[in-house]
From Swiss-Prot:
It comes from Mus musculus. Residues 171-210 are annotated as: Disordered. A motif (CAV1-binding) lies at residues 581-588. This is Tyrosine-protein kinase BTK. Transmembrane segments: none annotated. The lineage of its organism: Eukaryota, Metazoa, Chordata, Craniata, Vertebrata. The keyword Zinc applies. Activated by phosphorylation. In primary B lymphocytes, is almost always non-phosphorylated and is thus catalytically inactive. Stimulation of TLR8 and TLR9 causes BTK activation. As a negative feedback mechanism to fine-tune BCR signaling, activated PRKCB down-modulates BTK function via direct phosphorylation of BTK at Ser-180, resulting in translocation of BTK back to the cytoplasmic fraction. PIN1, SH3BP5, and IBTK were also identified as BTK activity inhibitors. Interaction with CAV1 leads to dramatic down-regulation of the kinase activity of BTK. LFM-13A is a specific inhibitor of BTK. Belongs to the protein kinase superfamily. Tyr protein kinase family. TEC subfamily. It is linked to Defects in Btk are the cause of murine X-linked immunodeficiency (XID). The modification Phosphothreonine is found at T191. It catalyses: L-tyrosyl-[protein] + ATP = O-phospho-L-tyrosyl-[protein] + ADP + H(+). GO terms for cellular component: cytoplasm; cytoplasmic vesicle; cytosol; membrane raft; nucleus; perinuclear region of cytoplasm; plasma membrane.
Length: 659
């Protein structure tokens, strides 16, 4: 699969290849490679690409140019507001929402595409001209206006493939003089009819005013980011940037204070206005027990942490004090409250408009707290999160950029090795054994999987598909497989740490659930642990591409019977609820420190017992509350099992109660 050069959501006008075809406009996800310009349906709620709707071979493109927008189009060429019926609402011209059209001309006529911004249009035209520059049939004249109602608005010619009416001034392609890649074509002299057309004055092409920075969203970099390819923009922690393009995808286009533009990872930034993420005292994903452990280790009077509360949308201030007479010190947790007027307080008499103002006040005044907030405490190294790919658009990875350092083990698809990308970035390299995977299907789906980005998912970086075996490149996790981690470290875990592992996995699965993406093989063996003990979910969705019948058949020796609900064992019916069942078994694995589920039974006996209603017993490290959560995942009726969102809420409640 060729690397994607550009990827954007545009409005596409129907090409009306038949005279009876309707004129309509649809949002499409456009992808450009060196070989094809393709467009797809796009699911905005799930943030993923849909079915392919069409493509154009790059070698067939003869011209790429802007189009002069039609002024005051009639109602039939206008579109309704999103979500409203056109017969019941004010019509809005298409150019008001996607005001920057351009055309891609090929052997079947012009394809009209509408961009939401002038900058995005310019970039696409530039890249398209770059990839077609060696084409042999580039035209010397084009139509600057739309083809509408059977004719071009600029010259009234009625043949869709009629020669253009305006001469291109060496703008179509970018060949240097004397290039041997294609013969230079001199334009033919105009016919008398064309000469008359050319003498007609054309309507002036509108000039787009540069985007004012006051109209753009301002963000602050949370981490440094060094560009990995030419499309990227460098980030410096604490500096401000302006967002030029924002999407559901994990890369946004931005501009720095010097006017440099490029793509940045969206998980490396936060909104500049009233954001608390940039402050040293804030730890977004820290739990109550982690905060207590860190404050005790620091042992400083007035040490404090501001963290997300277990209650959605709330914050908690955790404070350590020695002055209470307790030899080990005392930790108090204060929920940041708010009034109906959006004023924040810890003590009701002291109200503030923002949380930073609140913290600043209590850094100088205890005002009812166990101690004033003297020392912000945080993890020594707040590691930057993984990016979705090694730079924007970097999908196909060059094997020459990989250095293999050591073998990590052997998985379902082959050997896994630890290595470096370009000598500096840690990666895991899965070398796919030939015949073990449906490779073509995986490669098509992996582009979607790369856009799944969450801090508790092992990030897919890219693939190497131009040789065999193919490689899958992912985030490296230093402590390896969760199952082995549990077995090897079994005497060192406190129950609170085990619950945090469950929370980590549940957060990842809630994210996949929100994207309507199934894992299909959730188990401790398919989760990995990083150097800080954070658990991340791996191999999501890969089981669909296994070619081994012993793995894919429910009666096969390798099928994950012990993690499968009745509807999967009997009917191979996978759903988010079958992932819920598997999560309950994974919780059991964690609290049993890596034991085999149903260890006394064979696979066939296990399947029989599950069908009869047998469920796993409560591990001795699991409290009744924890066991209630895992047991709720094993309801015989799939619809009666909770969602991952509910499970996460229940786990957070237990974390607060048992800490």
């Amino acid at each position: 699969m060729a690397a994607v050069i550009l990827e954007s959501i545009f409005l596409k006008r129907s090409q009306q290849k038949k005279k009876t075809s309707p004129l309509n406009f649809k949002k499409r996800l456009f992808l450009l490679t060196v070989h094809k310009l393709s467009y797809y349906e796009y699911d905005f709620e799930r943030g993923r690409r849909g079915s392919k709707k069409g493509s154009i071979d790059v070698e067939k493109i003869t011209c790429v140019e802007t189009v002069i927008p039609e002024k005051n189009p009639p109602p039939e060429r206008q579109i309704p507001r999103r979500g409203e019926e056109s017969s019941e609402m004010e019509q809005i011209s298409i150019i008001e929402r996607f005001p920057y059209p351009f055309q891609v001309v090929y052997d079947e006529g012009p394809l009209y595409v509408f961009s939401p911004t002038e900058e995005l249009r310019k970039r696409w035209i530039h890249q398209l001209k770059n990839v077609i520059r060696y084409n042999s049939d580039l035209v010397q004249k084009y139509h600057p206006c739309f083809w509408i109602d059977g004719q071009y608005l600029c010259c009234s010619q009625t043949a869709k493939n009629a020669m253009g009416c305006q001469i291109l001034e060496n703008r179509n392609g970018s060949l240097k003089p004397g290039s041997s890649h294609r013969k230079t074509k001199k334009p033919l002299p105009p016919t008398p009819e064309e000469d008359q057309i050319l003498k007609k004055p054309l309507p002036p092409e509108p000039t787009a005013a540069p985007i004012s920075t006051t109209e753009l969203k301002k963000v602050v970099a949370l981490y440094d980011y060094m560009p990995m390819n030419a499309n990227d923009l460098q980030l410096r922690k604490g500096e401000e940037y302006f967002i030029l393009e924002e999407s559901n995808l994990p890369w946004w286009r931005a501009r720095d204070k010097n006017g440099q533009e490029g793509y940045i990872p969206s998980n490396y930034i936060t909104e500049a206005e009233d954001s608390i993420e940039m402050y040293e005292w804030y730890s977004k994903h820290m739990t109550r027990s982690q905060a207590e452990q860190l404050l005790k280790q620091e042992g400083k009077e007035g040490g404090f942490i501001v963290r997300d509360s277990s209650k959605a949308g709330k914050y908690t201030v955790s404070v350590f004090a020695k002055s209470t007479g307790e030899p080990q010190g005392v930790i108090r947790h204060y929920v940041v409250c708010s009034t109906p007027q959006s004023q924040y307080y810890l003590a009701e008499k002291h109200l503030f408009s923002t949380i930073p103002e609140l913290i600043n006040y209590h850094q100088h005044n205890s005002a009812g707290l166990i101690s004033r907030l003297k020392y912000p405490v945080s993890k020594q190294n707040k590691n930057a999160p993984s990016t979705a790919g090694l730079g924007y658009g970097s999908w196909e990875i060059d094997p020459k950029d990989l250095t293999f350092l050591k073998e990590l083990g052997t998985g379902q698809f082959g050997v896994v090795k630890y290595g470096k990308w370009r000598g500096q970035y840690d990666v895991a390299i899965k070398m796919i054994r030939e015949g073990s995977m449906s490779e073509d299907e995986f490669i098509e789906e992996a582009k979607v999987m790369m856009n799944l980005s969450h801090e508790k998912l092992v990030q897919l970086y890219g693939v190497c598909t131009k040789q065999r075996p193919i490689f899958i490149i992912t985030e490296y996790m230093a402590n390896g497989c969760l199952l082995n981690y549990l077995r090897e470290m079994r005497h060192r875990f406190q129950t609170q740490q085990l619950l945090e592992m469950c929370k980590d996995v549940c957060e990842a699965m809630e994210y996949l659930e929100s994207k309507q993406f199934l894992h299909r093989d959730l188990a401790a063996r398919n989760c990995l642990v990083n150097d800080q003990g954070v658990v991340k979910v791996s191999d999501f969705g890969l089981s669909r591409y296994v070619l081994d019948d012993e793995y894919t058949s429910s009666v096969g020796s390798k099928f994950p019977v012990r993690w499968s609900p009745p509807e999967v064992l009997m009917y191979s019916k996978f759903s988010s609820k079958s992932d819920i069942w598997a999560f309950g078994v994974l919780m059991w694995e964690i609290y049993s420190l890596g034991k085999m589920p149903y260890e006394r039974f064979t696979n066939s006996e296990t399947a029989e017992h599950i069908a009869q209603g047998l469920r796993l017993y409560r591990p001795h490290l699991a409290s009744e509350r924890v066991y209630t959560i895992m047991y709720s995942c094993w309801h015989e009726k799939a619809d009666e099992r909770p969602s991952f969102k509910i499970l996460l809420s229940n786990i957070l409640d237990v974390m607060d109660e048992e800490s």
